[in-house]
Amino acid sequence: MPSKRTLAQHLSVGIITVANAYAQLAVEGYITSREKKGYFVEDVSSYRVRRKAAAAMLPEAAEREYFADFKANRISLQNFPLATWTRLMRETLSVHNEELLKTVPYKGVYELRKAVADYLAHNRAMQVDPSQIIIGAGTEYLYGRLLQMFGHACTFAIEEPGYKKFASISASFGNPWKYIPIDDNGLMIDKLEESGADVVHLSPANHFPTGIVMPVTRRLELFEWVNRIRKRYIIEDDYDSEFRYTGRFILPLYAQDTQSRVIYMNTFSKSLVPSLRISYMVLPPRLLDRYEQTMSFYSCTVSSFEQYTLARFISEGYFERHINKMKNYYREQRHKILAAIHASPLAAISQITERNAGTHFVLHINTRLTEAEVRKTALAADMCLSFYSDYSHNTEENNGCTLVINYAAIEADKIAAVIERLSSLFPECNQIS
């Protein structure tokens, strides 16, 4: 190679520029420096480098917007207190400017865990220490940590129908699982015993999609099952439990547990907004040491900025006020959409199952159409429907079709038009009208 000075003069550039270029080539192994002799090029002729074509920019399909979307993960967005949330974000930047630059504790920031513990004490009768609470970006992440902690030798039980995603997460971790049928009182304990499962996942306060509330007699049977063998546990998913329109909240299993066997799970994605990927689990004291010893190397997956903001949103009372506001809104939505169905041709060919809780109900329609035909017709009519079978692994064809009507995201002024279009999907309604 020419000397640095010679090459600099030849290219009319500074010698420092050439020196930096030579140094980079030397670091990458293309040239070597020999004392008092200069730079020599390494023999790399045996390596052929093929020029790669520029990566094609593939268009990303935007999520389709429907005239009516009854999917279960939709909520009313226009009621979110954005101005309050924005103000708290600004205050978080001001108050916690130094903490925001530090590593987030693996369980989550203390302020949020303390706020959640206080909320659970006041609204769920749960006596929880902040050290028992683990914050994560979505329940899927937290379920993954539990599956990993329990290990492949542990068999899980899942309600049928129920939260199918838990089965998918179990499969991805290589954990075996069993589906357990439900009856009018919830998960059937005799079938759970027969399954040989070690850990059961269920939603006793508001089963999805049926809305069944597990009565105290069935709860006592469940506690008998879990207390019979030391390695058994219950994962209680309290999703959507805030929206109960009559009476007080349903007491969680965690609050009734005397043997430290219940793991409590909940999320803010339904009560606030889906984009706020903050969920939490409460570990019973007997599992806390095990989690800390085996899972503490995982970093917290939620930014401290969002955690501090949510902590203030809860501790200053905004969260509870928002829940009360949304309960009133969803109660009115439920009333309007049920009234619209009763006033439509659907009333003559359908039966409604609703439990005065959550943001959905079940609508069974007596039709000659198959579910596949209804799905196809609905999409053509710009409607996204949710079917009861979507939450069951049993794909056996039944008479008629059963819909899960999640009305949270249906705009109030569109309800009449939405039900009219839903009715038009079924030829039986057209004959009535």
How would you label these PLM feature ranges?
Residues 251-252, 292, 310, 341:
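Catalytic cores of nucleotide-enabled group-transfer and carboxylate-activating enzymes in metabolic
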Residues 176, 232-233, 383-384:
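Residue-level detector of anion-binding/catalytic polar loops
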Residues 36, 255-290:
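Active-site PLP attachment segment
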Residues 116, 280, 308-315:
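Helix-loop "lid/cap" segments that line or gate small-molecule binding pockets
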Residues 99-230, 242, 248-260, 330, ...:
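Conserved core of the PLP fold type I
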